[in-house]
């Protein structure tokens, strides 16, 4: 089993920890907890770069090795890093588990060394009709991010 972790920090007290685990060539399971967010849906993505020199803005676009459009996690036409939304409770926190087969921890398209980002707004999953729907899901600003690193 390969494991990885990202510690998210950001503006306005938003923070969290996200764990990744993959058995062999199987799907990757992502479990995490976030706090300091406004209640509701927030876009959650793996971005292409693990560069946080300019905060979350330098993490680049969504991880998209196949050159597809933005979409929902269950869509065939989606960025590999499109993980949909997390639903934040009234207390500003969320605990979540996601399983995805497009974000491996090993191999050519490994997400290790890339960044995970939580956004200010909900991800419209590429279906909102906004000019940004097919690139970012119109998910708004980047509130917190962390670089995905291997874990013992």
From Swiss-Prot:
Keyword Zinc belongs to the record: yes
Organism: Zantedeschia aethiopica
Alphabetized InterPro entries for the sequence: SOD-like_Cu/Zn_dom_sf, SOD_Cu/Zn_/chaperone, SOD_Cu/Zn_BS, SOD_Cu_Zn_dom
One Gene Ontology CC term in the entry: cytoplasm
UniProt GO molecular function: copper ion binding; superoxide dismutase activity
EC number: 1.15.1.1
Lineage top rank: taxon: Eukaryota
Residues the record lists as binding Cu cation: 45, 47, 62, 119
Protein name as annotated: Superoxide dismutase [Cu-Zn]
Cysteine disulfide partners in this protein: 56-145
Subunit-structure text: Homodimer.
Protein localization: Cytoplasm
Protein function: Destroys radicals which are normally produced within the cells and which are toxic to biological systems.
Keyword hit for Nucleus: no
Free-text comment on the cofactor: Binds 1 copper ion per subunit. Binds 1 zinc ion per subunit.
Keywords, ordered alphabetically: Antioxidant, Copper, Cytoplasm, Disulfide bond, Metal-binding, Oxidoreductase, Zinc
Catalytic activity: 2 superoxide + 2 H(+) = H2O2 + O2
Cofactor: Cu cation; Zn(2+)
PROSITE patterns in UniProt: SOD_CU_ZN_1, SOD_CU_ZN_2
Positions annotated to bind Zn(2+): 62, 70, 79, 82
Record-stated family: Belongs to the Cu-Zn superoxide dismutase family.
């Amino acid at each position: 089993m390969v494991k990885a972790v990202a510690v998210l920090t950001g503006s306005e007290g938003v923070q969290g920890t996200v764990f990744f685990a993959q058995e062999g060539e199987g799907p990757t399971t992502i479990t995490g907890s976030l706090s300091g967010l406004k209640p509701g849906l927030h876009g959650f993505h793996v971005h292409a770069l693990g560069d946080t020199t300019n905060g979350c803005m330098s993490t680049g676009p969504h991880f998209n090795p196949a050159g597809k459009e933005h979409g929902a996690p269950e869509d065939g036409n989606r960025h590999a890093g499109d993980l949909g939304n997390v639903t934040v409770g009234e207390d500003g926190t969320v605990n979540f588990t996601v399983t995805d087969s497009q974000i491996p921890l090993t191999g050519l398209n490994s997400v290790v060394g890339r960044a995970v980002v939580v956004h200010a707004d909900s991800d419209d999953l590429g279906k909102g009709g906004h000019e940004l729907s097919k690139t970012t899901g119109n998910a708004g600003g980047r509130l917190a991010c962390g670089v995905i690193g291997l874990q013992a």
